[in-house]
């Protein structure tokens, strides 16, 4: 009896197991997608609305006014310096053109930088007080100041009164007053010369000596922050340019290699100010002539 050997069974193919993702992961992805879609939708809508509102305001021609009533428009900054046309009214010239014409022979220096003037330096003369400075120094000073650095004289005159023009009688009175002032000055100089020529008595001599022994000192705030003590006339005048009258008139009228075409006195007169208070000597010189 024969035995039947069963044939081996064929191997079954491996079964593929599909694992479904958990529900939480699916919900997270869906929420992120909706979040980004909503965010970008709102962002683009806002940009579109802002563009439309701005275009509408520009189309209707008007500056955008703030909806906040408490927000006031900012006032324009006030310029603390001097006007450019007033600065240009002061003449500029090289120091070499007036160096040999000065009445004094001691050196001049700029009160701002404290440097002595050289021949190639360009100077600017303040015709109100005849203090002279380097053009760069004084122009930089006038950007934030309206006064002379030495004597502190205000170079920005007050606004003229409205609808007031000097009459002919007032002009005649001004001319007569200037002439009388000149005569009084000449008379005062003559009296002073007579008193100097007269020899004082012993009591007067002692009093004069006491007065001469008193030092003439005074402090003043300097432009660089320190104080100056003046004792000698040379120290008092080292910032002042003293010239002969014909040279002074030529410089103040802007004919000696200057950039300005209008003098300070003409500028003040055109604007309706009383230029006699600013120490301009050109009008007095013409009245003497």
Curated annotation (Swiss-Prot):
Residues 191-207 have a biased composition (Polar residues). It holds the Pfam family zf-RING_2. It catalyses: S-ubiquitinyl-[E2 ubiquitin-conjugating enzyme]-L-cysteine + [acceptor protein]-L-lysine = [E2 ubiquitin-conjugating enzyme]-L-cysteine + N(6)-ubiquitinyl-[acceptor protein]-L-lysine. SUPFAM superfamilies: RING/U-box. PROSITE patterns: ZF_RING_2 (PS50089). Pathway: Protein modification; protein ubiquitination. Keywords: Membrane, Metal-binding, Transferase, Transmembrane, Transmembrane helix, Ubl conjugation pathway, Zinc, Zinc-finger. The RING-type zinc finger domain mediates binding to an E2 ubiquitin-conjugating enzyme. This is RING-H2 finger protein ATL29.
């Amino acid at each position: 009896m024969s035995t039947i050997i069963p044939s081996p069974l064929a191997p079954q193919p491996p079964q593929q197991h599909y694992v479904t993702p958990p529900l939480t992961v699916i919900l997270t992805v869906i929420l992120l997608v909706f979040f980004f879609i909503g965010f970008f939708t709102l962002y683009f809508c806002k940009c579109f609305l802002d563009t439309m509102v701005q275009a509408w305001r520009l189309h209707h021609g008007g500056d955008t006014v703030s909806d906040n009533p408490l927000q006031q428009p900012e006032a324009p900054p006030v310029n603390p310096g001097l006007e450019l046309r007033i600065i240009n009214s002061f003449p500029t010239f090289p120091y070499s053109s007036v160096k040999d014409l000065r009445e004094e022979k001691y050196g001049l220096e700029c009160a701002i930088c404290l440097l002595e003037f050289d021949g190639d330096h360009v100077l600017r003369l303040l015709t109100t007080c005849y203090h002279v400075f380097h053009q760069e120094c004084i122009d930089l000073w006038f950007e934030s100041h309206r006064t002379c650095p030495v004597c502190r004289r205000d170079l920005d005159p007050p606004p003229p009164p409205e609808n007031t023009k000097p009459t002919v009688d007032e002009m005649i009175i001004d001319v007569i007053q200037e002439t009388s002032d000149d005569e009084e000055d000449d008379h005062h100089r003559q009296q002073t010369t007579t008193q100097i020529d007269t020899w004082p008595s012993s009591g007067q001599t002692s009093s004069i000596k006491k007065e001469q022994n008193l030092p003439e000192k005074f402090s003043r705030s300097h432009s660089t922050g320190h104080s100056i003590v003046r004792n000698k006339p040379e120290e008092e005048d080292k910032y002042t340019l003293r010239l002969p009258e014909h040279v002074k008139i030529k410089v103040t009228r802007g004919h000696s290699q200057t950039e300005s075409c209008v003098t300070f006195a003409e500028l003040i007169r055109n604007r309706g100010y009383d230029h006699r208070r600013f120490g301009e000597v050109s009008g007095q010189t013409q009245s003497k002539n």
